[in-house]
Curated annotation (Swiss-Prot):
Biased composition (Basic and acidic residues): 268-282
Localisation per UniProt entry: Mitochondrion inner membrane
Top enzyme category: lyase
GO cellular component, one term: extrinsic component of mitochondrial inner membrane
Pfam families: Coq4 (PF05019)
Alphabetical GO biological process terms: ubiquinone biosynthetic process
UniProt-listed Enzyme Commission number(s): 4.1.1.130
Reaction(s) catalysed (UniProt annotation): a 4-hydroxy-3-methoxy-5-(all-trans-polyprenyl)benzoate + H(+) = a 2-methoxy-6-(all-trans-polyprenyl)phenol + CO2
Transit peptide residues according to the UniProt entry: 1-19
The name this protein goes by in its record: Ubiquinone biosynthesis protein COQ4, mitochondrial
Length: 302
């Protein structure tokens, strides 16, 4: 009779011993999840998830979004503020949506796997200058030369926590000049606003939507032209075009730019440089006529 309780005790001890590794693993897993989700302070930041990453508290992220957003509206030339606003507002919804769009595309998945970077050295700009006129590469490098810009000026993503999402935003940022070349929109405030409206309709990134409000800072003629011509073009083409984040630009350099536009479903907008030139010429003629009229009045009064 006494041996039965002893056997029961030994069985219980053995059962607990067998379960201990499983319990320890479960506790460790719970601790890891809690640590990953716990709040932290500016004095106790978690380690960065990738080189250059700066983890932010919710308060810091909100402050960065509000501050950079307001100041970038006041001074649209501050690219650093625009970049900070983009990163502060890109998560948790908008960049993950772009990543999911890339994962749904065979080309997008290859981009995420290869993680190419767009720089002067990676693109081999001298080779692009030798490509036939009308190709994507030749159009892109001609646009760079005409506007006096390089692909090496894009800031590195710092405030997006997920490493893959950070790359998606970096890829979007480095592809921006290709969007300019594809649409032939110049690097002037009016051109940037029109392109940002197109990007917002296509990507839904909040930064691109905020940048569209810079239209209120345009001159009257530019603002009227944006509302009448380029905003309708941007909304129509941005919504109907394929996800431009999925273009593997490095593989399209020898593609005819007209064919790529058709493949993406993008119509080129009216030539903004020509429209701005016509406006300047008309303004110059009006000023000349006013001067001549004033000179005529002065001569008649003598």
């Amino acid at each position: 009779m006494n041996s039965s309780p002893a056997r029961a005790v030994r069985a219980l001890v053995q059962s607990q011993s067998r379960q201990r590794p499983t319990l320890e693993r479960a506790c460790l897993s719970c601790a890891t999840v809690v640590h990953a989700r716990r709040c932290f302070s500016v004095l106790d930041r978690p380690p960065p998830n990738y080189p250059g990453h700066v983890p932010l508290t919710r308060v810091e992220r909100a402050g960065l979004a509000v501050g950079s957003g307001l100041w970038s509206l006041l001074d649209p030339r501050r690219g650093d503020l625009i970049a900070a606003f983009a990163e502060a507002t890109a998560t948790p919804y908008f960049v993950p949506r772009l990543r999911d769009a890339m994962l749904a595309s065979p080309t997008g998945r290859r981009i995420l796997r290869d993680r190419p970077r767009i720089t002067s050295s990676s693109l081999d700009l001298p080779r692009l200058r030798s490509l036939p006129q009308g190709t994507v590469g030749a159009t892109y490098v001609a646009w760079l030369d005409r506007e006096g810009v390089t692909p090496d000026t894009r800031a590195h993503v710092r405030y997006v926590d997920d490493e893959e999402c950070a790359y998606v935003l970096q890829r979007y940022r480095e592809s921006h000049d290709f969007y300019h070349a594809l649409t032939a929109l110049p690097v002037v405030r009016e051109g940037e606003v029109a392109l940002k409206a197109f990007e917002f309709a296509n990507t839904l990134l909040p930064m691109t939507g905020l940048a569209t409000f810079a239209a209120f800072t345009l001159r009257e003629g530019e603002r009227r032209r944006f509302v009448d011509t380029y905003l309708p073009w941007a909304v129509k083409n941005g919504l109907r075009a394929k996800e431009i984040i999925n273009v593997y630009w490095e593989e399209e350099m020898e593609t005819d730019v007209v064919d790529l536009r058709k493949a993406l479903g993008i119509e080129p907008p009216p030539d903004m440089r020509d429209a701005r030139k016509r406006e300047r010429d008309a303004r110059r003629r009006r000023k000349q006529l006013e001067t001549e009229a004033q000179q005529g009045l002065d001569a008649a009064s003598l």
